[in-house]
Amino acid sequence: MTILVAEDDMIMLKTIEYRLKKDGHNVIVSHDGREALEEIERSSPDLIITDIMMPFSSGLEIISAAKKKNGKKISVIVLSAMGQENVVLEAFQLGADDYITKPFSPNELSMRVKRYELVISGVQSL
């Protein structure tokens, strides 16, 4: 599965990238929102994992762009330190499929990604 990770914190980005690659995924990284928006158009990933607060474009803009992409359903997991209810609700209203608050467990992220991989491949449960 091809996963786009949009995260401006380099340590966090490398942690997520390492875990996803270890799980066998093709990982595309974006260091800011603008790069992520360009990558959505260029590569059309199966899944996006995005932070909310990033330079140039926010994770909320990334969710909107992913959900407007024609021809392909792109699932979005938000991974953010912003756990305020209004932010979480806005993310879901824009079309986020999941929301994980930092700090997070790499094992939990791995299991959630696995769940989306199974859904994408047509299997509905673990």
What are these regions (language model features)?
Residues 13, 55-56, 84, 102:
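The feature encodes the CheY-like receiver
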Residues 14-22:
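Charged docking surfaces used in two-component/phosphorelay signaling
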Residues 17, 61, 83-98, 115:
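Alpha4 helix (beta4-alpha4-beta5 surface) of REC/receiver domains from two-component response regulators
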Residues 24-31, 39:
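Short hydrophobic/Thr-rich beta-strand motif most characteristic of the beta2 strand and flanking loop
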Residues 32, 58-62:
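Acidic catalytic/metal-coordinating carboxylates
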Residues 43-49:
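Active-site beta3 strand of CheY-like receiver
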Residues 86, 104-114:
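C-terminal output helix
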